[in-house]
């Protein structure tokens, strides 16, 4: 993996990352900034996998491949239970990172989710019925989920049973509740960092 302080040109980014299919390289050439953020999401998925399996015999260490693409590792090419979890976690990580980058204004292709509202509260802290106030820029979760689908599902072949299982696991990871829980979990961890 490249040091985080090195910024790569878009064409170089797409050429240096190993394990991409021709279709993913095409997506990379169309939106290199978003793909770079997607790889941050994949690395986030690897870290979360290591955290979840830290006390198990298999602890995601095989995902630490020379490229920044955990999908290039051998475990992701097989139908193990762990790889099912990793597909879901990867899809959620990409959706999370892209949604967050949208909210931070780091991507040209998207912006804030216009639904950045929160319930208005009275002086005692109770939510007022049907009263909303603007709370700033929220994560553009819909864009993150769509990009995750566009970038990760394109590597799967239509007729292959394992590919259908992988897409199913990707969809499970992209379920809104899963991604929102990941957002909440990671946001709370950042407060302590």
Language-model segments: which ranges?
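Long, position-biased, composition-driven segments near the start of the mature protein
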Residues: 1-193
